Amino acid sequence: MRTALITGGGRGIGGAISKKLAADGYRILLTYCNSSKPAEMVVDEIRDSGQDAVAVNCDVTDAREVALLATHPWVSEKIDVLVLNHGRYDRIDVKDLDMKHLRRTMSTNFEGAFLIWESVKNHLTDAARICVIGSQLGTRGSTHGADYSASKAALEIWAKSLAMKLGPEGKRVNIIAPGFVDTDILAGDSEEKRASRIEEVPLKRIGTPED
C-alpha cells in the first residue's frame, strides 16, 4: 500500500491534496494542529470513498511531537509521497513586525518543514516524491506578511537544494508557489482587496484548493 504524508492536510490546499492523493490510491496520513474538525471531515470523506486515512495532531514546531509522528506505523512502513503544506500567515504590517512574530512564523513555516523532513527522511522510499508548498510571496515580498514571505523564500532555496542532492538518487523534490487561493489566508480580505487580487490574475478569478 502506497502512503502519503501531508502536513496541514486537513483543510485548504492541504485538504484538497489529501483527497486527490487518496483518489489516486494512496492511504493518507495527514497532520493538523489544534483544530481537529476540518481534518476529521477530510478523513471521513476519504474513508467514505473506500480509501484509508488517519489524522494526527502534530505541532510542527515541537520536536517531540514531530518525533512521535515519525513512530507512526505507516511511517515505519515507508512513505511514498511527502507533502510539506503546513503554514501560518498573521498579516502583520512590515513596520510592526517584531522578533517574536518573525521567529514564530519562521519556526512554523521553515523550521517545521525541516523538522518533519529530518524525522522521516530515513523512512522515504527510494523513489519518493517530495512536494513543498511555497508561495509567490516568497519571491516578491509583502507589506503585510514580510515574515511569511521570508519563510517561503527560505523554503524555496532549501527545496531546490534538496532536489539537487536527492535527484540523482531517484527522489524528486518540487516546490509549488501558489498565488491567490481561496483559503483561510484570504478570509480577512475586504471586497476591495479581493477585487484587486482578481485583477492581478489572468483568469480573473481567485484560485481554489482543487486547482
What are the residue ranges of the model-derived segments?
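Active-site loop immediately N-terminal to the catalytic Tyr-X3-Lys motif
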Residues: 95, 140-146, 168, 204
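Substrate-binding pocket helix/loop in short-chain dehydrogenase/reductase
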Residues: 93-94, 98-103, 186, 197
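Residue(s) in the substrate-gating loop at a strand-loop-helix junction
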Residues: 135
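Conserved glycine-rich cofactor-binding loop
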Residues: 10-11
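Active-site helix of classical SDR
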Residues: 117, 151
